[in-house]
Amino acid sequence: MASPAVATRRPSPTFLVSGPHHRLRRHEYSPSKLGSPSSASRLKVTALFGWIKGDRVARTRELIPSAESYTLTGSASEVDMKPREVSISVVSSIMDIPPAEWDACAVDSAEPEKLNPFLTHAFLSSLEESGSAVKETGWLPLHVVARDENGDIVGVVPLYLKSHSRGEFVFDQSWAEAYHSYGLEYYPKLQSCVPFTPVTGQRILLRDTSYRDQVFDALVKALKNLATKLNVSSLHITFPSEGEFGNLKDRGLLQRIGLQYHWRNRNYKSFDDFLMDLKQPKRKNIRQERKKIPAQNLKMKRLRGDEIKSSHWDTFYKFYRNTTDNHWGRAYLTREFFHLLGEKMGDKVMLIVAEHDDKLVAGALNLIGGDTLYGRLWGCLPDVHFPNLHFEACYYQAIEAAIELNLSRVEAGAQGEHKIQRGYLPVTTYSCHYFLEPGFATAIGNFLVHETAQVKHVINVLRDSGPYKEDIMKEFAPQLDNEM
């Protein structure tokens, strides 16, 4: 879970490597390779974010290209596969897609342990319905849909036309500055992601069919074609799965890596079991931090489903706004979003709250996946200061909950090297990028080669400083190495 203090403290070494402070230098690209900016052709698309009057729905439909047909053929090992036709189209709202059909692609019924709640229709529609991820906030939905000959949906891609780089957690502001310095427009751009959510997961969502690999290929081609038709600068697929990361490289997208901090469950039966895997000084420190919670007359509760009332969401929204107003400077999520989340996904939501004298003073929002607890947001009342409460609510309570629910891991969000000493180890995250300007594609590709080496070095250094005993780290090593 990202610490709100990141915005006001000295940037961490990791942030300097992968964040907006790391610049693409002018000598790394040549204007002679770029050509002149086609400002006239871009102007119409850019204006989408400046609508003032008129029928917005009609104008959105003008933007959306007509459906395209793709013929699917088998690979070399599938020579007997009958050619199939799929039609790929774009919709301006996820509400145009039946929830059951979207989720048939996003949720693998054969492997429920892989459920990613952020990819469900319920979560994404809550973002749109609440006015959080919509055209007015710079997130114009352009979701891509693949249908078979019978009109059944066999694949979808959550996609947005964006007028900025906020709420993404993969920093490309220096790329935008480089475009601007040569008179080119970086925005709008296409972004496949879960808005405001740095969680790894599938981005090309496929129904379980015998020809899903071919649908994947068709959808990637359609994404590239859409970028060309809209005449945007680029296409970005952020926080894809590791498998998609490799497949998208094979299809011409540039690769970028970052890092997060995750906790892993070694079949622990209790929090004390987990502590016994740590070096003695780290174990002692955590116990001391946890003792300070009851000593400050704080009571922790983990609420789920119907236990979370409307009043809880109103209070948590105050916590959230206190965090954004004092640290981030922008509230991406509306009050209505939290209420919709509770209504649509109550069984997948865990709200960890702290009470002081029977009054809610702080809270942490988590979502429950098939095998993972996802820590998302943290906040407290203004002027509230209880030492170690952030660590308790965001990290230790999450670990306890994961052990109780028999979940394999806790993903505690972006940034925060302080998580390492509390049992969260650095893991690799992924993103893929496609640029229509060949000169910039080459320059950014070269930049990413050097950045990747730096990020891998940082991950190795951070792992060496981990809190676990040496034999435990040896057990973790194969998994961690595979993720690099």
Sequence positions of predicted segments:
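N-acyltransferase acceptor-side catalytic subdomain
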Residues: 2-484
